[in-house]
A protein has these predicted regions:
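Nucleotide-activated donor-binding/catalytic signature segment of Leloir-type glycosyltransferases, i.e.
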Residues: 11, 19-42
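Short alpha-helical segment that forms part of, or immediately flanks, the ligand-binding pocket
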Residues: 45, 63, 68-72, 86-87
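Short alpha-helical donor nucleotide-sugar binding micro-motif in glycosyltransferases
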Residues: 45-51
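A short hydrophobic beta-strand element within the catalytic core of glycosyltransferases
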Residues: 54-55
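Aromatic "clamp/platform" in nucleotide-sugar-dependent glycosyltransferases that forms part
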Residues: 59
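Short hydrophobic beta-strand element within catalytic cores of glycosyltransferases
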Residues: 76-79
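Conserved acidic donor-binding segment of nucleotide-sugar-dependent glycosyltransferases
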Residues: 91-103, 111-116
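A charged, aromatic-enriched C-terminal amphipathic alpha-helix characteristic of glycosyltransferases
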Residues: 100, 113-145
Length: 145
């Protein structure tokens, strides 16, 4: 198809690299601009702020903190319609951010890569999890205020 893109893969590294990461590193060698662990939160956040699209394919997730961090940095999430995501991101209001199966995922990701005008803003979702909001709730729960 000839769609041009760059790839950022951040995450923990282990002593032995999983075969899928070795294969990805080789297959996408010209597209990868960063792959691996970030030594500081600032480094991690800087990569998130550089990203446009966050394709999520994870099979197990309890809250989705890393997804929420990326969305806070204005990444457009493409999420499976399962796990915690429909509740966190209101799948009825934000239906375009969700895919139902592999074919739907492929089509939506291709469309996002071609149509760079993403036109999204999910700040109202991330704001309620921002520390400035959460700290007040924690203080109230612990009767600190």
């Amino acid at each position: 198809v000839g769609i041009q893109f760059k790839l950022i893969i951040v995450g923990q590294e282990f002593d032995t690299e999983m075969p899928i990461f070795t294969e990805s590193r080789n297959f996408f060698k010209d597209e990868i601009i960063h792959m691996g662990y970030c030594k500081s939160f600032e480094d991690y956040a800087s990569w998130l702020w550089k990203a446009d699209i966050l394709p999520v394919t994870i099979n197990q997730e309890f809250f989705g903190a890393s997804v929420m961090e990326a969305v806070y940095c204005n990444c457009y999430p493409l999420l499976p319609k399962r796990l915690t995501y429909p509740e966190l991101f209101n799948d009825r209001v934000n239906a375009l951010h969700f895919y139902h199966n592999t074919n739907d995922y492929d089509n939506k990701l291709k469309s996002l890569l071609i149509n760079q005008n993403l036109g999204h803003n999910l700040n109202e979702i991330t704001q309620k999890y921002d520390w400035s909001t959460m700290s007040i709730q924690y203080d109230q729960l612990m009767n600190i205020t």
